[in-house]
From Swiss-Prot:
Catalysed reactions listed for this entry: 2 a quinone + NADPH + H(+) = 2 a 1,4-benzosemiquinone + NADP(+)
A cellular component term, taken from the record's GO annotations: extracellular exosome
Protein name, UniProt field: Quinone oxidoreductase
Sequence positions bearing N6-succinyllysine: K296
Organism of this sequence: Homo sapiens (Human)
Keyword Translocase on entry: no
Length: 329
């Protein structure tokens, strides 16, 4: 470390494992932006389920150790590297990715992954945009190729990606059904675009959905927990319907015949398969949503950096989401 280089607090992971491997350090050097990079003073950072999978070492993408988790930061530009002329010190921004990690007081990001944060949204809301909204947009528009008038079922609709999917789907003219496991979660889902909501903790909730949609079935299902729901999803689909798998935490047995009569599809989605051009498309659509007002992130649990392990525990094992989980700095 260079003499006199500024230090910051940051969460570091030195080995893969449970939430206990998240270590808060106060001796981490503040990064210096290089060509096409910016340094952001972080005010808030979103916590996403994928970050727990990466931390555990079970995800397809394994960072080099040690590393700092976190992609979705919101804050203020602190410094700008060469050729990052779209930004200046003091700009309010949010990110869809970081280079140095977001669970920190400062984060380094490539300029093409940084976006202006409108004044009407606060930093907590800014930290809730990145992975949730970009993933929901990719799932609905890019992968499902939704058309106005189609129906969509959003499983786990009260979480960050779920609420984003509800807001986007409503803006694009879809009929939206959502599921949530708590009364508060169901209320939030209805407030954010869903036409009807079902309690997925009820044993017969699938039967209730079937009764509600009738023989036609559902055109699109946004699936957050495929290892639990995929087989049931196939029974709910319309002819030509598609299940978009956004999340899964294990394996499941399905009958491929269930896809044949309806000529239905199962499509997996991962945000980071998107090209740079696709990210720019998503950003343009979402920026319009912020300006018009249909994109309005709902904030759920909030934690200080010191309680990051608790946040990781609760995002997987909590009683039910009611908005986007964030870390406050």
């Amino acid at each position: 470390m260079a003499t006199g280089q500024k230090l910051m607090r940051a969460v570091r992971v030195f080995e893969f494992g449970g939430p206990e491997v998240l270590k808060l350090r106060s001796d981490i050097a503040v990064p210096i932006p290089k060509d096409h990079q910016v340094l952001i003073k972080v005010h808030a950072c979103g916590v996403n389920p994928v970050e727990t999978y990466i931390r555990s070492g079970t995800y397809s993408r394994k960072p080099l150790l040690p590393y700092t988790p976190g992609s979705d930061v919101a804050g203020v530009i602190e410094a700008v590297g060469d050729n990052a002329s779209a930004f200046k010190k003091g700009d309010r921004v949010f990110t869809s990715s970081t280079i140095s990690g977001g669970y920190a007081e400062y984060a380094l990001a490539a300029d093409h992954t940084v976006y202006k944060l409108p004044e009407k949204l606060d930093f907590k809301q800014g930290a809730a945009i990145g992975i949730p909204y970009f993933t929901a947009y990719r799932a609905l528009i890019h992968s499902a190729c939704v058309k106005a008038g189609e129906s969509v079922l959003v499983h786990g609709a009260s979480g960050g990606v779920g609420l984003a999917a509800c807001q986007i789907a409503r803006a694009y003219g879809l009929k939206i059904l959502g599921t949530a496991g708590t009364e508060e979660g169901q209320k939030i889902v209805l407030q954010n675009g869903a036409h009807e909501v079902f309690n997925h903790r009820e044993v017969n909730y699938i039967d209730k959905i079937k009764k509600y949609v009738g023989e036609k079935g559902i055109d699109i299902i946004i699936e957050m927990l495929a290892n639990v729901n995929l087989s049931k999803d196939l029974s709910l689909l319309s002819h030509g319907g598609r299940v978009i798998v956004v999340g899964s935490r294990g394996t499941i047995e399905i009958n491929p015949r269930d896809t044949m009569a309806k000529e239905s599809s199962i499509i997996g989605v991962t945000l980071f398969s998107s090209t740079k051009e696709e990210f720019q498309q998503y950003a343009a659509a979402l920026q319009a949503g912020m300006e018009i007002g249909w994109l309005k992130p709902v904030i759920g649990s909030q934690y200080p950096l010191e309680k990051v392990a608790e946040a990781h525990e609760n995002i997987i094992h909590g009683s039910g989401a009611t908005g986007k989980m964030i870390l406050l700095l």
